[in-house]
Each structure stands twice: as structure tokens, then as C-alpha cells.
Amino acid sequence: MTRKNQRQQPKPGRVSRRVFLRAAPLSSLLAPLALRPPNRIYASSSRPDDIRIDDVSCDYEEYRYRAPYKFGGREVDRTTLLNVRCIVRTASGRSAHGFGSMTMGNVWAFPSQQMSYDKTLGAMKALAEQIRKITADFREPGHPIDINVWLEPEYLKAADEISRRLDLEETIPKLCTLVTASPVDAALHDAFGKIHGVSSYQTYGRDFMAYDLSHYLGPLFKGEHLDEYLLTEPKRRLALYHSVGASDSIENSDIRQRINDGLPESLREWIRYNGLTHLKIKLDGNDLAWDLERMVHIDRVTREVQQELGVKEWVYSLDFNERCPNVTYLVDFLHYVKERTPAGFEMIQYIEQPTARDLEKHRENTMHEAAKLRPVVIDESLTSLDRLMLAREMGYTGAALKACKGQSPTLLIAAAAQKYRMFLCVQDLTCPGASLVHSVGLAAHIPGVTAVEANAREYVPSANKPWESRFPGIFRVKDGMMSTADLNRPGLGAVE
């Protein structure tokens, strides 16, 4: 995409009250999200610290995986990164550049049985251009969170329009729109921190934000501010969650043909190489016997290696990528695991969303029974605050937070989830480079999160190469831990 040279001022009131009302959360426990006429939202709350957007530009990077990553019944062998740069300015004339990057992850964000990989990726690129233009044309001053809240309905409208224009067999889903918009949102947060010379995580209190959390999350949050649910200084260390894809080799004997690129090629080798203590296990969800044998096999090999290394504590998370037909499948699986390997069962820390992402359509898939055994976290369905409330109603006890859903939405959901005492974890979307720095930064600043997933190092290490010397504590993992103490640079910290 090209940089925009000339822009027109948006027409007064171009976002109607009807559009805003359609964007309101469904739950009566949540307040409407900035349901005010656009010409009053910022006029009534404009502050000297607010930013105006001068420019937004985008470009792409393409990478091939060193080995395929299988999840949700599909194998992924490539990735496209969307990089976003912005220029912002304060009323006093100060300016700053911001940067955001995210893998487009169309197989996960826009799964389709009817459209090809290239077609869904093309739709996301078309949407990215519209989101870039919408954001670049926005002229009101504000905090990045308020700008995102105000523009999200426009992004969703653009997704619908592109779906019609491209005559897509399926409409671009909201999750896909969030992923596509996430590097734009990140760039604004990055620029906002830089223009004030502080970490972005020090800009979420009353000194920089016009509203308390009740404005976004409802009356239960009256008088509370976002920074009360965040750490202004990062944790010093985080455990690394290593993904074990459904087609990954467990033993060296499983390797069909060596890659010979100097990196590990089996789980046994990876545990030794990085000193891993946290494993995310991808399962099928539609083959109980296979899932059970896979789990038992991984647990046996992990136990053997950890005993050799003298490691006594490690944990697993389980991810069925929505493929379980019902909660009975999950409960049966957990009981069988407990029978076959009681010690392995005790190592299970949490379970990611096991059934279909459309919660409204599948209200029968409640998680109450499974959640009695282990925390069950909402993931693919978690696209808004009302989805969080519905997930709680259906028995989910945790929330998966992801930078790929946007810095603004993720921080607000993290606050709400903490209020409701939900289990929290931070996962990635095979995020390399700056997107991983962003993701790790989230995990390092959210209370209660002790680990972060980072699997680009396994599947697309070439995209990490330029970043290894700049952030060795993140990209060169030792003893299963990342060093995160220096994630307090201005902005989001990835690019100066």
C-alpha cells in the first residue's frame, strides 16, 4: 500500500448514531461504547496530551515456514506480516512516529471451507487498505483507546462492504477485522507513548485518559482506571509456552526427513535446546483415541527428558482448536488422561476453547463440567465484551489475550476479566519480530500472567533473525524463560 499524500476532512457526523447503537454490547451489564455523536466525543474530552493522526502507511513481508504447523485440522506453511507506520501530532505541535506489525493469520482469523488461502488473504489485504484509509482520514484528537473505540464500527462496516465488493462466499468475520486492524491500533499506541517519552503502559491512567473504565465497561467500573489493572513496570521474566503442533515430531524417530538447519526437529530436542517447562499441545478434537495416545506420548517423552535434566516442575495447556463436537468429548478425554497418566493430568494448566467459536449458535456447548476439572479459556470467540459475558454464562473460566486482536480491545477485556476473577493467559498467532515484542509486552504488564506463547521461533525463525540481537532476552530463550525487564522503552518498545 502507498502512503496517502492528500486527505479530505471527514464529513461532520459521517458515523450515524444508528451505527453506534448497532455497535453496543448486548449484555445489560456493559455500558454502550462511546455512543455519542462523533462531533462531540472528542470536543468534550479533548486534552493537551491527545494526538491527531497525520499519516498512516502499510507494507507487507512474506515468509515461508521451515516446517508446517498443523492445528485445527490444517497445516500452515507460510505467513504474511502487515507492517503499519503512523505519524501523530499533539496540539502543541510535537510529533512522533509509531510502528505496529502483525501476522495476518488468515487460516485462523478467516477459516473457510469454500475459499482458498489466497482468496481469504486477498480479502484481508483489501480490508487493510480500507482500515488504513479510514484511520488516516480521521481528524479528531484523542487517546489511542478512544480512537479505536470510535473507529471500530467503521472497520466492521468496511469489512462488510469489501465482502460484497469481492463477492466473497463468506462475509469477513469480526475476528478477522480485529486481526487486520491490530497493527494500526498498535502503531497509534506506540506513537502515543513515544510522543510523551514513556512506555505505552504508563499512558493508561487519568493523567492521559479522559474517561474512567465505566465509559467502556459499564457502571461496575465507575471510578476505576485502566492502569489499575496493569503493571506500569514489566515483570522481569516470563515462562515460554512452546507449541507442539499436531504433526510435529515427538521423538527423533518420528522425523521423516531432517531439515538440518541447526535448530531442533523433535520435541525431545526442543526441550533440551530451550530448557522448556511449558508445552501447548495441539490436539485433533475429532479423534478421541488419537488425542489420548498423542497426549500420553508427549507426556512420556517430556517426563523422560525432564528427569534427565533434573527438572521437577512443568505444565501443559491443551488446544483442540474448536474441533470437539461437545463438552462430553473433552470431559471423557480428561478422565482417560487421568487414568492413563495421573501425573500427566496434574500437569495440565488450562484448556483453550474446545468447541465451535459461534457461541450463539451453539449454546448447548457449555463448559461447566469441564471447568470443574481445569480452567477453560475463551479464545476464538472472544471478539468483544459481550462475548466475554456470554462465555462466562456458558461456563468458561478464563480468557486468552492476544495482541492480534488489538491493543485497545485486549487491554479492556483484560480489565474486565480480572474484575470477574477469570484465569488469564497470553497467546500469539505465530508472531515474529515486532509482533512478538508486542505480545510479550502485553504478558509482561498484565497481572497474573506468568507465561507467553511464542512459536514463530519454531516455524518461521527467519522472520526473527533481525530482532535477535536487539532483544536477546526474548528471542534467545534459556531455561524456558524470557527476560522481559527491559520492555519499558518509549511506546510499545519494539522500534525506536
Language-model features, listed with the residues they occupy:
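Flexible C-terminal active-site loop/helix
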Residues: 429-496
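Short, Gly/Pro- and small/polar-rich lid/capping loops
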Residues: 44-85
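Catalytic core of soluble alpha/beta enzymes
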Residues: 281-430, 435-436
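N-terminal secretory signal peptides and thylakoid transit peptides that target proteins
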Residues: 5-28
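Short, acidic/polar
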Residues: 256-271, 383-390
